[in-house]
Amino acid sequence: MSEIKNLNPTCIWKNFYALTQVPRPSGHLEKVQQFLLDFAKEAGVEAFKDPADNIVMRKPASPGMEKKKGVILQAHMDMVPQKTPESTHNFETDPIQPWIDGEWVKAKGTTLGADNGLGVAAIMAIMEDKTLKHGPVEALITADEETGMYGANDLPAGELQGDILLNLDSEHWGKFVIGSAGGINITATLDYKEVETDSEDAAVKVTVKGLRGGHSGLEIHEGRGNANKLLVRLVREAIEECEARLASWEGGNMRNAIPFKAEAVLTLPKENVAALKELAQDWLEDFVDEYKGIESGIEVICEDVETPKMEVPEEIQDNLINAIYGCHDGVVRMIPSYPSVVETSSNLAIIEIGGGKSMLKILARSSREDMKDYIVKTLESCFNMAGMKVETAGSYGGWDPNPESEILHLLLKEYKDLFGQDGIIQVDHAGLECSIILGKYPHLDVVSFGPTMKSPHTTTERALIATVEPFWQLLKKALEDIPEK
């Protein structure tokens, strides 16, 4: 694993490897914050943790370059904690195990954390290199981006000093992002009083798994399967045809990841167990056919389990199943003027039912505020009909594109000069912190770019080694050629 430190450019890869050894799942950032502060002290640059738990670093201009515009390099320190079903990894205590697989860097059994660890590693490389030529440089390494962009949302006004912001959280080398979608978290809850299970009933845990999952913004347009939405189809028919009752449900664990696994414990008359298992096999065949060419590993597994003492009341069960069934999931609309770009979507990310409580979590995204409001009200209507309480949180606006951006055209020119190709200007459906930061610092000139990564937020996350070196070359060259104020 340590051979990753020897990849080129070593200044980035050694820092990235060091980051993989520091636990940093969203919500548990104390260790990585201290790691970054210790790094800054060793590098001899000013650094502090701000009231929003972000880490800010400042490096003065190189001699003779003091009049250049100040640049803020921005990335987020947290990572999405996903692991394979068989993994025993503890994200709060264990290091990630990166490894080289041909042209890619991957992780063993978990997310890699290249989103956004490679961006942080590049910032570290800039901060510690005394030979680079640049104007004033700041680093803004934000907290808890993956769970609600809390570090950016709580960023104090007046803290940053720069004129240009380079966000290093994009995942397609050669593409320069100048706009992104806004988003909002929607949580629907319903408490209920459990009822006793029929003492003669059996219980079966039905699991849908083996789906690809993925980033609910960047990959929502691919039509990947959502384990929660597949499972509800099976469960509803089991209730109707096998006299099944719902005892519990658990599906998904991250608001911004497409769920790749969901499971429900059903109780039912013992004589209907065989019919349930046959029904599950029929649904598996349907799912495999539906997702041909998209999902290759779908599994539907039925496992006999101990019969729980309590289950969901029938009326509440039916309301919850209707809510899950009716909840919109996936693309709502493409941008009419850019039909290849998603405008509005929703992701039924997390379902937890059991013990007298139920909760559904959805992340809705849109580049239009009116359409974001539309999908929120659509989902509210669905959940209200089921008697659920609906709350929204973490709303952030979209990042409006500025195709006349001075830093954009500098990057495009230097990309062409360095690599002989034209860069691609892009608007992403993913949420980036740029929109929130621009709301607090509207004078900033902002572009996002980075090396190529695939399948972020999943256990197949990987970084393309060959794109990190040119990314580093462009970043250095851009800092050197930033214009004067």
Residue locations for each model-derived region?
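Acidic/His- and Gly-rich active-site-bordering loop/insert found
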Residues: 3-103
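Active-site-adjacent substrate-binding region
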Residues: 226-228, 233-249, 401-444
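Fold-level recognition of mixed alpha/beta catalytic cores in primary-metabolism enzymes, strongest
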Residues: 137-227, 235, 239
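His/Asp/Glu-rich mid-to-C-terminal helical/loop segments that flank catalytic regions of hydrolases
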Residues: 158, 224-241, 269-273, 318-325, ...
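A short beta-alpha structural unit
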Residues: 17-21, 264-265, 299-311, 347-351, ...
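Active-site metal-coordination/substrate-binding segment of hydrolases
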Residues: 65-136, 141-147, 152-163, 185, ...
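Acidic-enriched catalytic cores of C-N bond-cleaving enzymes acting on peptides and small amides
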Residues: 179, 196-201, 220-250, 270-345, ...
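Zn-dependent metallopeptidase/amidohydrolase metal-coordination segment
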Residues: 9-12, 336, 343-356, 421-477
